[in-house]
Amino acid sequence: MAEFVRAQIFGTTFEITSRYSDLQPVGMGAFGLVCSARDQLTNQNVAVKKIMKPFSTPVLAKRTYRELKLLKHLRHENVISLSDIFISPLEDIYFVTELLGTDLHRLLTSRPLEKQFIQYFLYQIMRGLKYVHSAGVVHRDLKPSNILVNENCDLKICDFGLARIQDPQMTGYVSTRYYRAPEIMLTWQKYDVEVDIWSAGCIFAEMLDGKPLFPGKDHVNQFSIITELLGTPPDDVINTIASENTLRFVKSLPKRERQPLRNKFRNADDSAIDLMERMLVFDPKKRITAAEALSHDYLAPYHDPTDEPVAEEKFDWSFNDADLPVDTWKIMMYSEILDYHNVEAGASGLEDGSVPAQ
Protein backbone atom coordinates (compact mmCIF):
# COMPACT_ATOMS: atom_id res chain seq x y z
CA MET A 1 0.00 0.00 0.00
CA ALA A 2 1.14 3.51 -0.74
CA GLU A 3 1.92 5.77 2.19
CA PHE A 4 -0.11 8.99 2.28
CA VAL A 5 0.80 12.31 3.83
CA ARG A 6 -1.50 15.25 4.57
CA ALA A 7 -1.03 18.98 4.07
CA GLN A 8 -3.35 21.96 4.47
CA ILE A 9 -3.51 24.19 1.36
CA PHE A 10 -5.90 27.18 1.43
CA GLY A 11 -7.87 25.40 4.16
CA THR A 12 -8.17 22.30 1.99
CA THR A 13 -6.68 18.97 2.99
CA PHE A 14 -4.29 17.61 0.39
CA GLU A 15 -3.79 13.89 0.99
CA ILE A 16 -1.14 12.62 -1.39
CA THR A 17 1.29 9.75 -1.65
CA SER A 18 4.75 10.24 -0.18
CA ARG A 19 6.09 10.14 -3.74
CA TYR A 20 5.28 13.87 -3.93
CA SER A 21 6.84 16.59 -1.76
CA ASP A 22 7.09 20.38 -1.48
CA LEU A 23 3.44 21.18 -2.22
CA GLN A 24 2.85 24.79 -3.31
CA PRO A 25 -0.54 26.23 -4.35
CA VAL A 26 -0.77 27.20 -8.01
CA GLY A 27 -4.44 27.91 -8.65
CA MET A 28 -8.01 27.30 -7.58
CA GLY A 29 -10.81 26.42 -9.98
CA ALA A 30 -14.49 25.64 -9.59
CA PHE A 31 -13.84 21.91 -9.50
CA GLY A 32 -10.36 21.56 -8.04
CA LEU A 33 -7.28 22.96 -6.36
CA VAL A 34 -3.94 22.72 -8.19
CA CYS A 35 -0.56 22.57 -6.46
CA SER A 36 2.96 22.19 -7.75
CA ALA A 37 5.01 19.39 -6.23
CA ARG A 38 8.28 17.53 -6.60
CA ASP A 39 8.02 13.97 -7.92
CA GLN A 40 10.61 12.01 -5.92
CA LEU A 41 10.50 9.15 -8.43
CA THR A 42 11.38 11.18 -11.52
CA ASN A 43 12.91 14.24 -9.80
CA GLN A 44 10.61 16.43 -11.91
CA ASN A 45 8.24 19.20 -10.89
CA VAL A 46 4.60 18.26 -11.47
CA ALA A 47 1.11 19.70 -11.09
CA VAL A 48 -1.21 17.89 -8.67
CA LYS A 49 -4.92 18.63 -9.08
CA LYS A 50 -7.31 17.65 -6.31
CA ILE A 51 -10.83 17.08 -7.59
CA MET A 52 -13.20 18.48 -4.98
CA LYS A 53 -15.87 16.01 -3.82
CA PRO A 54 -15.82 13.90 -7.00
CA PHE A 55 -18.49 11.53 -5.67
CA SER A 56 -20.84 14.09 -4.11
CA THR A 57 -23.31 14.06 -7.04
CA PRO A 58 -23.78 11.98 -10.20
CA VAL A 59 -23.03 15.09 -12.31
CA LEU A 60 -19.66 15.70 -10.62
CA ALA A 61 -18.79 12.00 -10.71
CA LYS A 62 -19.53 11.87 -14.43
CA ARG A 63 -17.54 15.04 -15.09
CA THR A 64 -14.53 13.62 -13.22
CA TYR A 65 -14.82 10.32 -15.06
CA ARG A 66 -14.95 12.17 -18.39
CA GLU A 67 -11.86 14.24 -17.58
CA LEU A 68 -9.97 11.11 -16.49
CA LYS A 69 -10.91 9.23 -19.66
CA LEU A 70 -9.85 12.17 -21.82
CA LEU A 71 -6.52 12.62 -20.04
CA LYS A 72 -5.81 8.92 -20.50
CA HIS A 73 -6.73 8.95 -24.18
CA LEU A 74 -5.18 12.18 -25.46
CA ARG A 75 -1.43 11.76 -26.00
CA HIS A 76 0.13 14.63 -27.90
CA GLU A 77 2.99 17.09 -27.43
CA ASN A 78 0.61 20.06 -27.35
CA VAL A 79 -1.92 18.52 -24.96
CA ILE A 80 -1.34 18.16 -21.22
CA SER A 81 -0.58 14.55 -20.31
CA LEU A 82 -1.36 12.47 -17.24
CA SER A 83 1.65 11.16 -15.30
CA ASP A 84 -0.16 9.67 -12.29
CA ILE A 85 -3.59 9.36 -10.73
CA PHE A 86 -4.67 8.10 -7.34
CA ILE A 87 -7.56 8.06 -4.87
CA SER A 88 -6.72 9.08 -1.32
CA PRO A 89 -8.04 7.35 1.82
CA LEU A 90 -10.56 10.22 2.06
CA GLU A 91 -11.80 9.24 -1.44
CA ASP A 92 -10.59 12.39 -3.14
CA ILE A 93 -9.16 11.99 -6.62
CA TYR A 94 -5.82 13.48 -7.61
CA PHE A 95 -4.60 13.97 -11.19
CA VAL A 96 -0.86 14.45 -11.62
CA THR A 97 0.30 16.12 -14.84
CA GLU A 98 3.30 17.95 -16.23
CA LEU A 99 4.00 21.34 -14.67
CA LEU A 100 4.51 24.24 -17.05
CA GLY A 101 5.71 27.54 -15.65
CA THR A 102 2.95 29.86 -16.80
CA ASP A 103 -0.08 30.23 -19.06
CA LEU A 104 -0.93 32.43 -22.01
CA HIS A 105 -3.21 34.65 -19.93
CA ARG A 106 -0.34 35.59 -17.61
CA LEU A 107 1.99 36.15 -20.55
CA LEU A 108 -0.51 38.41 -22.32
CA THR A 109 -1.07 40.55 -19.22
CA SER A 110 2.65 40.96 -18.56
CA ARG A 111 4.06 42.13 -21.89
CA PRO A 112 3.41 42.38 -25.66
CA LEU A 113 4.37 39.29 -27.64
CA GLU A 114 6.79 39.50 -30.55
CA LYS A 115 5.76 38.13 -33.93
CA GLN A 116 7.79 34.91 -33.78
CA PHE A 117 6.28 34.01 -30.39
CA ILE A 118 2.74 34.67 -31.66
CA GLN A 119 3.39 32.47 -34.69
CA TYR A 120 4.92 29.69 -32.61
CA PHE A 121 2.17 29.74 -29.99
CA LEU A 122 -0.61 29.78 -32.59
CA TYR A 123 1.11 26.97 -34.50
CA GLN A 124 1.20 24.81 -31.39
CA ILE A 125 -2.45 25.60 -30.55
CA MET A 126 -3.57 24.54 -34.04
CA ARG A 127 -1.29 21.48 -33.97
CA GLY A 128 -2.90 20.42 -30.70
CA LEU A 129 -6.42 21.12 -31.98
CA LYS A 130 -5.80 19.09 -35.14
CA TYR A 131 -5.03 16.09 -32.95
CA VAL A 132 -7.85 16.68 -30.44
CA HIS A 133 -10.44 17.16 -33.19
CA SER A 134 -9.24 14.04 -35.02
CA ALA A 135 -9.99 12.10 -31.81
CA GLY A 136 -13.62 13.24 -32.02
CA VAL A 137 -13.22 15.68 -29.13
CA VAL A 138 -14.23 19.34 -28.90
CA HIS A 139 -12.48 21.29 -26.13
CA ARG A 140 -15.32 23.87 -25.79
CA ASP A 141 -13.53 26.11 -23.28
CA LEU A 142 -10.38 27.24 -25.05
CA LYS A 143 -9.03 30.46 -23.52
CA PRO A 144 -5.59 31.87 -22.65
CA SER A 145 -5.66 30.52 -19.09
CA ASN A 146 -6.19 26.98 -20.45
CA ILE A 147 -3.05 27.20 -22.59
CA LEU A 148 0.07 26.39 -20.60
CA VAL A 149 3.57 27.51 -21.61
CA ASN A 150 7.03 26.66 -20.26
CA GLU A 151 10.35 28.52 -20.38
CA ASN A 152 11.17 26.94 -23.76
CA CYS A 153 7.88 28.29 -25.20
CA ASP A 154 6.50 24.75 -25.44
CA LEU A 155 2.72 25.01 -25.30
CA LYS A 156 0.10 22.56 -24.05
CA ILE A 157 -3.69 22.77 -24.03
CA CYS A 158 -5.24 21.78 -20.70
CA ASP A 159 -8.50 21.52 -18.76
CA PHE A 160 -10.61 19.11 -20.75
CA GLY A 161 -13.27 18.88 -18.05
CA LEU A 162 -15.85 20.55 -20.28
CA ALA A 163 -14.87 18.71 -23.47
CA ARG A 164 -17.62 16.84 -25.25
CA ILE A 165 -18.17 14.52 -28.15
CA GLN A 166 -18.60 15.99 -31.62
CA ASP A 167 -22.38 15.97 -31.35
CA PRO A 168 -24.70 17.92 -33.68
CA GLN A 169 -27.06 18.59 -30.76
CA MET A 170 -24.65 19.96 -28.15
CA THR A 171 -26.40 22.19 -25.66
CA GLY A 172 -25.73 24.96 -23.19
CA TYR A 173 -23.30 27.75 -22.49
CA VAL A 174 -19.90 26.40 -21.64
CA SER A 175 -16.91 28.53 -22.60
CA THR A 176 -15.73 31.82 -21.13
CA ARG A 177 -17.74 34.54 -22.83
CA TYR A 178 -14.95 36.49 -24.54
CA TYR A 179 -13.86 33.42 -26.52
CA ARG A 180 -17.29 31.89 -27.11
CA ALA A 181 -18.31 31.14 -30.68
CA PRO A 182 -21.49 32.87 -31.89
CA GLU A 183 -23.23 29.57 -32.65
CA ILE A 184 -23.12 28.70 -28.95
CA MET A 185 -24.71 32.03 -28.05
CA LEU A 186 -27.20 32.01 -30.91
CA THR A 187 -28.50 28.47 -31.01
CA TRP A 188 -27.52 26.60 -27.85
CA GLN A 189 -27.22 23.56 -30.10
CA LYS A 190 -25.70 22.14 -33.27
CA TYR A 191 -22.10 23.04 -32.68
CA ASP A 192 -18.93 21.12 -33.33
CA VAL A 193 -15.12 21.42 -33.51
CA GLU A 194 -15.44 24.80 -35.22
CA VAL A 195 -16.17 26.45 -31.84
CA ASP A 196 -12.54 25.80 -30.89
CA ILE A 197 -11.34 27.49 -34.08
CA TRP A 198 -13.34 30.62 -33.21
CA SER A 199 -11.85 30.60 -29.70
CA ALA A 200 -8.35 30.19 -31.17
CA GLY A 201 -9.06 33.13 -33.50
CA CYS A 202 -9.99 35.30 -30.51
CA ILE A 203 -6.79 34.21 -28.74
CA PHE A 204 -4.78 34.96 -31.90
CA ALA A 205 -6.25 38.48 -32.01
CA GLU A 206 -5.45 38.99 -28.33
CA MET A 207 -1.83 37.95 -28.90
CA LEU A 208 -1.58 40.51 -31.71
CA ASP A 209 -3.33 43.36 -29.90
CA GLY A 210 -2.59 42.67 -26.24
CA LYS A 211 -6.23 42.80 -25.14
CA PRO A 212 -9.38 40.68 -25.64
CA LEU A 213 -11.02 41.12 -29.03
CA PHE A 214 -14.64 40.76 -27.88
CA PRO A 215 -14.85 41.76 -24.17
CA GLY A 216 -18.60 41.48 -23.74
CA LYS A 217 -20.25 42.42 -20.44
CA ASP A 218 -23.03 39.87 -20.96
CA HIS A 219 -24.32 37.65 -23.76
CA VAL A 220 -26.26 40.42 -25.51
CA ASN A 221 -23.35 42.85 -25.31
CA GLN A 222 -20.96 40.12 -26.43
CA PHE A 223 -22.91 39.46 -29.61
CA SER A 224 -23.28 43.19 -30.26
CA ILE A 225 -19.49 43.72 -30.02
CA ILE A 226 -18.90 40.84 -32.45
CA THR A 227 -21.28 42.35 -35.02
CA GLU A 228 -19.62 45.78 -34.70
CA LEU A 229 -16.46 44.23 -36.14
CA LEU A 230 -17.70 41.33 -38.26
CA GLY A 231 -21.03 42.78 -39.37
CA THR A 232 -24.48 41.23 -39.18
CA PRO A 233 -24.49 37.45 -39.69
CA PRO A 234 -25.69 36.32 -43.13
CA ASP A 235 -29.34 35.27 -43.41
CA ASP A 236 -28.51 31.59 -43.85
CA VAL A 237 -26.74 31.65 -40.47
CA ILE A 238 -29.52 33.63 -38.78
CA ASN A 239 -32.07 31.13 -40.06
CA THR A 240 -30.34 28.28 -38.20
CA ILE A 241 -31.16 29.88 -34.83
CA ALA A 242 -33.38 27.46 -32.95
CA SER A 243 -34.66 29.71 -30.17
CA GLU A 244 -37.49 32.03 -31.24
CA ASN A 245 -36.51 34.61 -28.63
CA THR A 246 -32.91 34.64 -29.85
CA LEU A 247 -34.07 34.85 -33.46
CA ARG A 248 -36.26 37.86 -32.66
CA PHE A 249 -33.39 39.53 -30.83
CA VAL A 250 -30.92 39.06 -33.70
CA LYS A 251 -33.42 40.28 -36.30
CA SER A 252 -34.16 43.36 -34.19
CA LEU A 253 -30.54 44.51 -34.29
CA PRO A 254 -29.53 47.18 -36.81
CA LYS A 255 -27.79 45.87 -39.91
CA ARG A 256 -24.04 46.31 -39.69
CA GLU A 257 -21.33 46.05 -42.32
CA ARG A 258 -18.22 43.99 -41.71
CA GLN A 259 -15.21 46.17 -40.84
CA PRO A 260 -11.81 45.37 -42.35
CA LEU A 261 -9.66 43.65 -39.72
CA ARG A 262 -6.74 45.62 -41.14
CA ASN A 263 -8.25 48.75 -39.53
CA LYS A 264 -7.99 47.17 -36.09
CA PHE A 265 -4.67 45.37 -36.53
CA ARG A 266 -2.60 47.97 -38.37
CA ASN A 267 0.77 46.44 -37.53
CA ALA A 268 -0.11 42.84 -38.38
CA ASP A 269 1.17 41.00 -41.46
CA ASP A 270 -1.22 40.50 -44.35
CA SER A 271 -0.94 36.75 -43.80
CA ALA A 272 -1.91 37.19 -40.12
CA ILE A 273 -4.99 39.20 -41.12
CA ASP A 274 -5.93 36.61 -43.74
CA LEU A 275 -5.69 33.70 -41.29
CA MET A 276 -7.68 35.55 -38.63
CA GLU A 277 -10.40 36.36 -41.17
CA ARG A 278 -10.66 32.65 -41.99
CA MET A 279 -10.97 31.75 -38.30
CA LEU A 280 -13.51 34.41 -37.30
CA VAL A 281 -16.33 33.50 -39.68
CA PHE A 282 -19.98 33.44 -38.56
CA ASP A 283 -20.81 30.29 -40.52
CA PRO A 284 -19.02 27.44 -38.70
CA LYS A 285 -18.88 25.32 -41.84
CA LYS A 286 -16.94 28.07 -43.64
CA ARG A 287 -14.40 28.44 -40.82
CA ILE A 288 -10.90 27.16 -41.52
CA THR A 289 -10.04 23.80 -39.91
CA ALA A 290 -7.06 23.24 -37.65
CA ALA A 291 -5.38 21.11 -40.33
CA GLU A 292 -5.95 23.81 -42.97
CA ALA A 293 -4.64 26.52 -40.64
CA LEU A 294 -1.39 24.62 -40.18
CA SER A 295 -0.83 24.90 -43.95
CA HIS A 296 -1.50 28.65 -43.99
CA ASP A 297 1.33 31.00 -45.02
CA TYR A 298 1.37 32.66 -41.59
CA LEU A 299 2.41 29.41 -39.94
CA ALA A 300 4.84 28.39 -42.70
CA PRO A 301 7.97 28.88 -40.53
CA TYR A 302 6.85 26.01 -38.29
CA HIS A 303 4.64 23.88 -40.52
CA ASP A 304 5.85 20.29 -40.95
CA PRO A 305 3.22 17.97 -42.43
CA THR A 306 5.25 14.93 -41.33
CA ASP A 307 5.10 16.01 -37.68
CA GLU A 308 1.49 17.07 -37.15
CA PRO A 309 -0.10 13.79 -36.06
CA VAL A 310 -3.73 12.82 -35.70
CA ALA A 311 -5.19 10.50 -33.08
CA GLU A 312 -4.73 6.78 -33.65
CA GLU A 313 -8.33 6.16 -32.67
CA LYS A 314 -11.46 8.10 -31.83
CA PHE A 315 -12.33 8.71 -28.21
CA ASP A 316 -15.05 6.37 -26.90
CA TRP A 317 -17.99 8.54 -25.87
CA SER A 318 -20.38 5.64 -25.21
CA PHE A 319 -20.60 6.54 -21.50
CA ASN A 320 -21.58 10.15 -22.09
CA ASP A 321 -25.35 9.76 -22.33
CA ALA A 322 -25.45 7.40 -19.35
CA ASP A 323 -27.48 8.51 -16.34
CA LEU A 324 -25.88 6.47 -13.57
CA PRO A 325 -25.79 6.60 -9.76
CA VAL A 326 -22.66 7.81 -7.99
CA ASP A 327 -21.64 4.31 -6.88
CA THR A 328 -21.57 3.10 -10.48
CA TRP A 329 -19.44 6.06 -11.61
CA LYS A 330 -17.14 5.33 -8.66
CA ILE A 331 -16.68 1.69 -9.71
CA MET A 332 -16.02 2.78 -13.31
CA MET A 333 -13.49 5.35 -12.09
CA TYR A 334 -11.67 2.77 -9.95
CA SER A 335 -11.51 0.50 -12.98
CA GLU A 336 -10.01 3.26 -15.15
CA ILE A 337 -7.41 4.07 -12.50
CA LEU A 338 -6.41 0.40 -12.14
CA ASP A 339 -6.20 0.13 -15.92
CA TYR A 340 -3.99 3.22 -16.08
CA HIS A 341 -1.56 1.83 -13.51
CA ASN A 342 -1.50 -1.61 -15.13
CA VAL A 343 -0.68 -0.09 -18.53
CA GLU A 344 1.98 2.15 -17.00
CA ALA A 345 3.44 -0.79 -15.06
CA GLY A 346 3.58 -2.85 -18.25
CA ALA A 347 5.35 -0.02 -20.04
CA SER A 348 7.85 0.06 -17.16
CA GLY A 349 8.67 -3.60 -17.70
CA LEU A 350 6.72 -5.04 -14.76
CA GLU A 351 5.53 -8.27 -16.33
CA ASP A 352 2.78 -9.00 -13.82
CA GLY A 353 1.19 -5.60 -14.42
CA SER A 354 1.08 -4.86 -10.70
CA VAL A 355 0.82 -1.26 -9.58
CA PRO A 356 4.29 0.04 -8.70
CA ALA A 357 4.75 1.32 -5.16
CA GLN A 358 4.10 5.05 -4.98
Curated annotation (Swiss-Prot):
One of its GO terms (cellular component) is nucleus. Activated by tyrosine and threonine phosphorylation. A motif (TXY) lies at residues 171-173. Residues 20-299 form the Protein kinase domain. The keyword Coiled coil does not apply. GO terms for biological process: stress-activated MAPK cascade. It is found in: Cytoplasm; Nucleus. CDD domains: STKc_Sty1_Hog1. ATP binds at V26, G27, M28, G29, A30, F31, G32, L33, V34, K49. Its main location: cytoplasm. The modification Phosphotyrosine is found at Y173. Its EC number is 2.7.11.24. The keyword Kinase applies. InterPro entries: Kinase-like_dom_sf (IPR011009), MAP_kinase (IPR050117), MAP_kinase_CS (IPR003527), MAPK_p38-like (IPR008352), MAPK_Sty1/Hog1 (IPR038783), Prot_kinase_dom (IPR000719), Protein_kinase_ATP_BS (IPR017441), Ser/Thr_kinase_AS (IPR008271). SMART domains: S_TKc. It catalyses: L-seryl-[protein] + ATP = O-phospho-L-seryl-[protein] + ADP + H(+); L-threonyl-[protein] + ATP = O-phospho-L-threonyl-[protein] + ADP + H(+). It comes from the Eukaryota. Disulfide bonds: none annotated. Keywords: Activator, ATP-binding, Cytoplasm, Kinase, Nucleotide-binding, Nucleus, Phosphoprotein, Serine/threonine-protein kinase, Transcription, Transcription regulation, Transferase. Belongs to the protein kinase superfamily. Ser/Thr protein kinase family. MAP kinase subfamily. HOG1 sub-subfamily. Proline-directed serine/threonine-protein kinase involved in a signal transduction pathway that is activated by changes in the osmolarity of the extracellular environment. Controls osmotic regulation of transcription of target genes. The TXY motif contains the threonine and tyrosine residues whose phosphorylation activates the MAP kinases. This is Mitogen-activated protein kinase HOG1. The gene is HOG1.
